[in-house]
Amino acid sequence: MGRVILSGASKGMTKPTVGAPISELAVGSPVRLSVNGTVTDFLIVNQGIPSNSILYDSSCNGTWLLMKNIYENRVWQSGNINKYESSDIHTYLNNTFLNLFESNIRDAIKQVKLPYRKNGGSGGSDQSGANGLLCKIFLLSGYEIG
């Protein structure tokens, strides 16, 4: 579905039996969180700011989680517009979907500045670092997929 970046452990967060804070878990470690009352599997895909990348600013310094399975299929945009910043999916992820997490988890998810193409398509301009798009949950881009 997308990524969330958590800032350390939060009271009530699901922890492994050893009780390590999420910030100390290795990349590839599984994490289980409740989404809309259902235990859902995530994987830790990064710790800190992605290495060797100037695309991300300090807001992205945290534990990056990827939902292991597709939660649901949603439309990108109901109109014929290719702008992620005003897309239906961006709005859904950072409002409706975000609110499916318990409040303590929602509070632990960091707001980050995500690299994106402002105004989309060939007429847009790449934005990154401090000029990134503010969000808490986002779809993977081609860059993040690798």
Locations of the language-model features?
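Collagenous Gly-X-Y triple-helix signature in extracellular proteins
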Residues: 2-6, 13-146
